[in-house]
Amino acid sequence: FDKHIKKSVPLYEWSHDVALKFSDFFLAEKSNIYDLGCSTGSFLKALSNKNKDKRHFYYGIDEIKEMCLIAKKKNKNNKNVKILNKKIESVKFKKTSLFTSFYTMQFINPRRRQNLFNKIFKSLNWGGALILFEKVRAPDARFQDMTTQIYNDYKIDQGYSPDEILSKSKSLKGIM
């Protein structure tokens, strides 16, 4: 998965680097941190390694069991990292200094998405943050077409075939 996402999403590694840098502004001693849609736990590992001396509590949430197993294995040496195999919407969040979400909200039904954002906001400590990276729709059809074309060109440059790109696009219809 890690290889796939880096190949499929432009600037994916950069988004992790930026979130790591921004995290310094929001984390006090013993902060709670949630990574929503943690997949293989790579970001949690990087964040917990960066903050070894601060005794934070890290929670990775993903509803895909196989991802959680990889995330647990990847973070097994850090007792402060907990991986939860649950739907994000079902988790009762503790008061939190930082939420991160990397290209996850697009997979939550739009009817439930706003309720989740409200729940996140209510769980934030004063001065806390949600660092969110997400695919968005352009403000008009012409710019959306341009963005889609550039994105498809990027995927072709990464070695995906036009059939693979079309298949992925069809699989996401009705979700995004």
For the regions a protein language model found, what residue spans apply to each?
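Conserved alpha-helix/loop element of class I SAM-dependent methyltransferases that forms part
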Residues: L11-E29
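Class I SAM-dependent methyltransferase SAM/SAH-binding core
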Residues: Y34, S39-E89
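Short conserved loop adjoining the S-adenosyl-L-methionine
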Residues: S90-K94
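A conserved beta-strand element that flanks and buttresses the S-adenosyl-L-methionine
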Residues: T100
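Short catalytic micro-motifs in class I SAM-dependent methyltransferases
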Residues: Y103-Q106
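A short glycine-rich, Lys/Arg-flanked "PGG" loop and its adjoining helix->strand segment in the class I
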Residues: Q114-W126
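Conserved beta-strand signature within the Rossmann-like core of class I S-adenosyl-L-methionine
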Residues: G127-K135
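C-terminal alpha-helical "lid/dimerization" subdomain adjacent to the S-adenosyl-L-methionine
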Residues: V136-M176
